[in-house]
Swiss-Prot record:
Pathway: Purine metabolism; GMP biosynthesis; GMP from XMP (L-Gln route): step 1/1. ATP binds at S225, G226, G227, V228, D229, S230, S231. This is GMP synthase [glutamine-hydrolyzing]. The active site is at C80 (nucleophile), H169, E171. HAMAP family: GMP_synthase. Its EC number is 6.3.5.2. SUPFAM superfamilies: Adenine nucleotide alpha hydrolases-like, Class I glutamine amidotransferase-like, GMP synthetase C-terminal dimerisation domain. PANTHER family: GMP SYNTHASE [GLUTAMINE-HYDROLYZING], GMP SYNTHASE-RELATED. The gene is guaA. Gene3D superfamilies: 3.30.300.10, 3.40.50.880, HUPs (3.40.50.620).
Amino acid sequence: MSKILILDFGSQYTNVLAKKIRLLSVFCEVLPWNTPLEDILQESPSGLIFSGGPHSVYQENSPKVDREIYNANIPILGVCYGMQLIARDFGSEVRGGENEFGYTPIVFYPGKLFQGLVDKDAFHTEIRMSHCDSVTVPPKDFFITASSQHCPVAAIEYPEKKLFGLQFHPEVSDSQGIGDTILSNFVKHICRASETWKIETIEKQLIQRIKEQVGEKERVLLGLSGGVDSSVLAVLLHNALGDRLSCVFVDTGLLRKNEVEEVKQQFLSLGLEIIVEDASETFFYELSGIQDPEQKRKIIGSTFIEVFDKVSKNLEVQWLAQGTIYSDVIESAKSCDATQVIKSHHNVGGLPEKLNLKLLEPLRFLFKDEVRALGKVLGLPEVFISRHPFPGPGLGVRVLGEIRKEYVEIVKHADSIFIEELKKANLYDKVSQAFAVFLPVKSVAVKGDCRHYGYTIALRAVESSDFMTACWSPLSREFLNRCSSRIINEIPEVSRVVYDISDKPPATIEWE
């Protein structure tokens, strides 16, 4: 199978880039920048991409590659830091100069990367720039294929060596299909990668992999959340293992309104019986007095595993399956040490070393949209596939600060009102994710001519294709007013409702 490998130097957009390539029906995998050359060559990649990153190539301890990689006859595309690295390795100078951020006028010249964009002489457009360093002059044998006012060397090519560089990010600069065209030219025309990454093929490969990984007499325990990921995984595992799968739904006390009963009914309709384990008191006890969001996530994660470990002893299982997907892995610990951890995900962070079960994560290299597509192939009802994502820690990360039962009940009620109104207005499927957040701050209001001192609820709705980046959803004033009025009137403890208008980045989708 053809594949493109991305060496990750720490860009926050590396995995957006991987998803863009997979959308071309070509498999793409992200590896740490310091992956040994021998391991890279064993993968037999059709092409390599050096990602962007936060470092400067002229820094003493900046990430570097084995220069023998340039003699492997593998097409290489450097993006931002990746281009600067190629330029430096071939003798050019990189220095800090005038910064360029945001949409910038740029000129493209004829080149293999720009086929279909530049017919004869030049193509003028705007592209999103985000860099502090620049290549001063192209290395020997390279020629310039793009320039901007403050970055004369905005793209370079050395066709004979199949080396290419872009100072901008094609994966996030696509306002007119430009980035998609550039990536398609590299992947399909320069690397000549075949289109073998198709969801029907993925289903068969995953089932085969599960059968190979799990012994013939071994059993698997799956924790259900009712969300897209665990629902798809449940059906996938059932198809692969049959009755050797045991599904357990843990009631953490941090779930949405009526979640337990809804999940039971959903899976019974699919022919899957589930065991419900009420561990809510345990979770509230362990979280008592804890305010730090990272600590809360890790406590929820470790408690979750302990509950599963206890249940597993009565079921004689050897494997614990989790619906971890690529974005969970990315946000918990980027695939290289050049970036910082944004937040731990309960599926992959805080796992105790004494875990008594082997870990099975069949979906960990699939993006959310790929999981949804897999669900359709598996025949899941639309109600499963179109459901908004729900964080593993549940409402534990939607109650800011200390988690108390009364706070959870308030946000649970507010969230159900918000979702109900979205569905009534036919907006639920038009936003990617929507929820309410409890803020442990009180403000003054007037209810029934009396002074009222109540809590604040924040509403958040975002639009995103991959959840690596997201834009806040511009819901109408009339709609938000309706939601606010219902929440304040129906929940006595609440006196104020606000709407979150923060994009990701800089904000994350969840507040904690």
